[in-house]
UniProtKB/Swiss-Prot annotation:
This is Acetyl-coenzyme A carboxylase carboxyl transferase subunit alpha. Pfam families: ACCA (PF03255). It is an enzyme of class 2 (transferase). The gene is accA. GO terms for cellular component: acetyl-CoA carboxylase complex. Its EC number is 2.1.3.15. It is found in: Cytoplasm. InterPro entries: Acetyl_CoA_COase_a_su, ClpP/crotonase-like_dom_sf, COA_CT_C. Pathway: Lipid metabolism; malonyl-CoA biosynthesis; malonyl-CoA from acetyl-CoA: step 1/1. PANTHER family: ACETYL-COENZYME A CARBOXYLASE CARBOXYL TRANSFERASE SUBUNIT ALPHA (PTHR42853), ACETYL-COENZYME A CARBOXYLASE CARBOXYL TRANSFERASE SUBUNIT ALPHA, CHLOROPLASTIC (PTHR42853:SF3). It comes from Mesorhizobium japonicum (strain LMG 29417 / CECT 9101 / MAFF 303099) (Mesorhizobium loti (strain MAFF 303099)).
């Protein structure tokens, strides 16, 4: 069953009523309810459309975190063939919060790095809820270096609340690992594309998102800190998370206006969680279009990337 968010209550009431009427009709306990179902379905669609056309930044945070949104592994299954995963950092161990490897995208070889949160209790624990440890970032660096060596474009899928803040991660050099991954991302000679598919949290996201092109899903978020964290620091009050979300400019629309990202990928009505296959296909189409542009360009991708991020620093 669909997991409704708190602000979706009006839509939830309508959709549950529709399900109830359909069940009664199937069991022969009600007659002549077709017109009522049609009327309620229209009301439900209209309510959902109106709701999602006017989402507040805090509501977008909730949508970006929705457990039913397609995750990194869903995009890999839906867009790529012959995926061959790479494991381990050749230093400490394997971190499954980072899923990476090589595959074919519409016939062309690509390197993929993504952050995976997991979709149920078992997989969330296995993937550490998408919070990457140092060995995950070092695995990402391995993939970047291999992509550069074999001249294969890099695609990254960003979905993390932030890097893992545990004591063990700090002891193993979390800050250094994030910095090295960011540096490796910037130093690539091959073209790179990054898509924020859910949460883009702090340095944990930036470490794999400093790409030539950065895209965001319509209801994704991208920020230096979570709204809760910002509220705790600024006001010593986590109940002001809504205020923080509004003032931090974390939505795709805000970031496109600020020229932090390059384009927004539209989501189906009601968000990616209601029609995962549609948003995965739309993401694939934009990636294909961008790769075609890259293939026909006589560009120094490393220099273009350098200028892109230096320009941000000059303008903000």
């Amino acid at each position: 069953m669909y997991n409704y968010l708190d602000f979706e209550k009006p839509v939830q009431d309508l959709e549950l009523k529709i399900l109830e009427l359909k069940k009664l009709a199937e069991n022969g306990e009600a007659v002549d309810v077709a017109d009522e179902i049609t009327r309620l379905e229209k009301r439900s669609r209209d309510a959902l459309r109106d709701l999602y056309k006017a989402l507040t930044p805090w509501q977008k945070v909730q949508v970006a975190r929705h457990s039913d949104r397609p995750h990194c592994v869903d995009y890999i299954k839906g867009l790529f063939s012959d995926f061959t995963p790479l494991a381990g950092d050749r230093n400490f161990g394997e971190d499954q919060a980072i899923v990476g490897g090589f595959a074919r995208f519409r016939g062309e070889p690509v390197a993929i790095i993504g952050q995976e949160k997991g979709s149920d209790t078992t997989s969330r624990l296995r993937h550490n809820f998408g919070s990457v440890r140092p060995e995950g970032y070092r695995k990402a660096v391995r993939l970047m270096e291999l992509a550069d060596r074999f001249k294969i474009p890099l695609l990254t899928l960003v979905d993390t609340a932030g890097a893992y803040p545990g004591v063990g991660a700090e002891e193993r050099g979390q800050a250094e690992a994030i910095a090295r991954s960011t540096s490796a991302c910037l130093a690539l000679k091959v073209p790179s594309i990054s898509v924020v598919i859910g949460e883009g949290g702090s340095g944990g996201a930036i470490a794999i998102a400093t790409a030539n092109r950065v895209y965001m899903l319509e209801h994704a978020i991208y920020s230096v800190i979570s709204p809760e964290g910002a509220a705790s620091i600024l006001w010593r009050d986590t109940t002001r998370s809504k205020d923080a979300a509004t003032n931090m400019k974390i939505t795709a629309q805000d970031l496109l206006e600020l020229k932090i990202i390059d384009a927004i990928i539209p989501e189906p009505m009601g968000g990616a969680q209601r029609a995962p296959e549609k948003v995965i296909a739309a993401t694939g189409d934009l990636i294909a279009k961008t790769m075609k542009e890259f293939a026909g360009a006589n560009t120094d991708f490393r220099e273009q990337r350098r200028e892109k991020y230096l320009a941000m620093g000059r303008s903000l």
